[in-house]
Swiss-Prot record:
Keywords: Cytolysis, Disulfide bond, Hemolysis, Secreted, Toxin. GO terms for molecular function: toxin activity. The keyword Coiled coil does not apply. This is Parbolysin P1. Cytolysin that shows hemolytic activity (on bovine erythrocytes, HC(50)=5.75 mg/ml). This hemolytic activity is completely inhibited by small unilamelar vesicles composed of PC/PG, PC/PI and PC/PS in 1:1 molar ratios (with at least 100 mg/ml concentration). The recombinant protein does not show hemolytic activity, suggesting that it is not properly folded or that it requires a free N-terminal end for its activity. One of its GO terms (cellular component) is extracellular region.
Amino acid sequence: GWPAYPGRNGIRSSVCQKKLGCGWRKLASLPVCKAFCLARKRFWQKCGKNGSSGKGSKICKSVIAHTFEKAGKGLIKLTDMAVATIIKYAGKK
């Protein structure tokens, strides 16, 4: 099924960023976090509450919607790990 619509306020990039704790302590993940939240906002704007038909229908799949809703936290965690690793190796040279 189609995931619950986060609401007009819930799809806002700033709300999404706050929920994910973007840039809080970890500035490295901020650009990734912002990009994710913006993409998520655009997705919901295009697809609406129940996956609009029409121009956006190709991307308006429940699988994508669920992925967007679940990806946030994992994405930020991964970015932080990757950045930490890069910094670690960069420091060795």
